[in-house]
Structure formats: C-alpha cells, structure tokens
Amino acid sequence: MRQYKEINPDIRIVGFSNSYSEELIKLGGEAVEGVAFPVIFFSKSDDPKVQEFVKNFKTKFGSEPSALTAQAYDSAGIYFTAVEKLGSDQDSAAVRDAIAEMSYEGVTGTTKFDANGDVEKSFTKVTIKDGEFVLLESGSNE
C-alpha cells in the first residue's frame, strides 16, 4: 500500500470487511491511514449492547471480539430467541419460520431476512485515523 499511496496519493482506498483488524494497523502503519472499510461490527460503537459485549468479552478472553465472533454471538441470539418464542413447539420448520419472521437487535445491528431467506443487514463504514479505527458513517447495505 505504501507504493500505491506514493503513486496515487489522492485516490481513496477501500478495503473489504475481513481486513478490519488491529493487525492491519500494526503491519501497515502510516500506509493504511485513511483506508475505509464497510464492517458489520464496530467494537468502538457507542451502542450500549456493543459496549457491554466488548467489555464482557475482554474480561473473559483478554482481547476485543472480532466481527466473526460478534456474528456468531448474534446468530446464537437469533436461534435462542426463536426457540424461546416457540416454547415446546421446536421442530426445525417452526424454528426456521420463527427466524424468518424475526427482526433481531444484536451487537451487529438489526438482522432480518427477506422472502428468500437472505439476510438484510446494514454496514457501518470505518476508516483508519491516527492509527485507530474510527466511525466514518453508518448506513444500509444498499
């Protein structure tokens, strides 16, 4: 990236969500300043659910949760919410239907599903500024 920024200093670089990691900042240094990312989970969000999740995760594991960890956490939350709603009627079709009708508010934001079962999710846009990930903007996946 250093060479790219030397050749094209005015072009904004947009990374993909899996690039969102503290390791990128450590390895990239100044070369990654200003790079933007769409992310499904932003650990520095001011959302109280996110703050509590990050605090509890750090206490237990000694580091911040990754986006994949947050997605797994919300996936479990979606499943358990559906099962709790159904009570004793917990066959797989009933669970699937309960999940399909749900709008779940989790640490990765709102999760819901369209008629095809595809997830509808908003992304948060972040950038690297002074060696830290900071919020650029929040928005939809459109």
Stretches found by the model and what they are:
Residues 1-142:
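Extracytosolic ligand-binding ectodomains
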